[in-house]
């Protein structure tokens, strides 16, 4: 690729959170121009981008007009709260959507990705059923059985998800799901509650050649569907890893767009069960900032820019622990940073979000050690020192 033309590449980031911020860091290292968009001012990625705009990305006309005005070489969605119709129309006009508009549409909707995996590709998932009105709730929940998970068909970061243990709690969970739903679809998915042994993310890079390249599995823990900690590598049976890779190949060969994908699985005994997929850097994959020779943000850029991707190797066992806010505040400040940074082989990332609220992810601790257990303990210890204050 001609280096002068490459330097002139312009990337438009739709969504400007902490994952987008790290993508901007890597893009600027390659001399790229980055424009960041979000629904609020001073979002994390905006703080590093060349230019930024605040718009309603769910408004089709606004999103189309903004993208046409900017004239980017690549449009890179970092969130799911956006107009898919706008992306589809722009792609038809020749604008590069990463990885492609169809993939963004399928993966943002639990109905579409579950049907693709389970019904079309015959990939094992938890038992599930869709519900589009409250009258169907009791009947379909009895078919799944209690306890069950109730999730909006469109949401992210665990918003609107409930563990329902009895039918008396169904209506409340239904209302919470609809309140936290994104997009125009008013419906939920009921899922069998799996008594799984562990869950993991398989970061997978799809090259423009169609080759899929796998990172080492990343173990993670969630609370109400939201990531709390992760670690790499995950000690698991090679046959289970191969099964997850085979499932991932099936899905990505169907979606067929270049970039990095975070593919989530459950393991129950000798079963590997597909959970979800994100066509972008994954929150659990922030561990790769210290664990791998090429982190997930570098890999995403290299893939959709069609740049070389040499062998991905593990540098050292590593772990993360998120820093959560316990209160609401504007322009939050932090205590305990000195104590957190005293922990050996540990880094602290403060995302720079302009406001905090209870349970909001405000930062993450990264830790590495030859002993994975020590890395995990150090990440937990460091994160526990930091408190968000007004």
From Swiss-Prot:
Residues that coordinate or bind N(1)-(5-phospho-beta-D-ribosyl)glycinamide = 18-19, 78, 283, 353, 360-361
The pathway that the record names for this protein is: Purine metabolism; IMP biosynthesis via de novo pathway; N(2)-formyl-N(1)-(5-phospho-D-ribosyl)glycinamide from N(1)-(5-phospho-D-ribosyl)glycinamide (formate route): step 1/1
Alphabetized GO MF terms? ATP binding; magnesium ion binding; phosphoribosylglycinamide formyltransferase 2 activity; phosphoribosylglycinamide formyltransferase activity
EC numbers for this chain: 6.3.1.21
Record: residues binding ATP: 110, 151, 156-161, 191-194, 199
Q: Which family does it belong to?
A: Belongs to the PurK/PurT family.
Q: How does it assemble?
A: Homodimer.
The protein, known as: Formate-dependent phosphoribosylglycinamide formyltransferase
Please tell me the species this chain comes from: Prochlorococcus marinus (strain MIT 9515)
């Amino acid at each position: 690729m001609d280096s002068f033309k490459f330097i002139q590449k312009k990337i438009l980031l739709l969504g400007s959170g902490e994952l987008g911020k790290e993508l901007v860091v890597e893009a600027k290292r390659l001399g790229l121009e980055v424009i960041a968009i979000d629904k609020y001012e001073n979002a994390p990625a905006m703080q590093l981008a060349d230019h930024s705009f605040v718009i309603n990305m769910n408004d089709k006309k606004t999103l189309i007009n903004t993208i046409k005005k900017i004239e980017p070489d690549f449009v890179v969605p970092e969130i799911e709260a956006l107009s898919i119709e706008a992306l589809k129309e722009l792609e038809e006009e020749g604008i590069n959507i990463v990885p492609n508009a169809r993939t963004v549409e399928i993966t943002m909707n639990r109905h579409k990705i579950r049907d693709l995996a389970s019904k079309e590709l015959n990939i094992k998932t938890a038992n599930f059923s869709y519900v589009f009105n409250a009258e169907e709730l009791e009947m379909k929940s009895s078919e799944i059985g209690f306890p069950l998970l109730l999730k909006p068909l469109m949401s992210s970061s665990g918003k609107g998800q409930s563990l329902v243990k009895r039918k008396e709690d169904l209506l409340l969970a239904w209302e919470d799901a609809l309140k936290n739903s994104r997009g125009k679809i008013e419906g939920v998915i009921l899922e069998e509650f799996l008594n799984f042994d562990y869950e993991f993310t398989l970061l997978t890079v799809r090259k423009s050649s169609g080759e899929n390249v796998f990172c080492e599995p990343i173990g993670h823990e969630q609370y109400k569907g939201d990531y709390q900690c992760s670690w790499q590598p995950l000690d698991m049976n090679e046959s289970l890893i191969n099964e997850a890779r085979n499932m991932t190949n099936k899905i990505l060969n169907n979606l067929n767009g270049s970039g990095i994908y975070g593919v989530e699985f459950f393991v129950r005994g000798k079963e590997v069960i597909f959970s979800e997929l994100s066509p972008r850097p994954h929150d659990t994959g922030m561990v790769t900032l210290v664990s791998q020779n090429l982190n997930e943000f570098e890999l995403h850029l290299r893939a959709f820019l069609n740049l070389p991707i040499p062998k991905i190797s593990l540098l050292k066992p590593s772990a993360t622990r998120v820093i959560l806010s316990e209160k609401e505040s504007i322009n939050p400040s932090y205590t305990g940073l000195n104590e957190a940074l005293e922990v050996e082989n540990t880094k602290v990332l403060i995302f720079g979000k302009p406001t905090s609220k209870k349970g909001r992810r405000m930062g993450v601790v990264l830790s590495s050690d030859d002993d994975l257990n020590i890395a995990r303990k150090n990440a937990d210890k460091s994160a526990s020192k930091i408190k968000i204050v007004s």
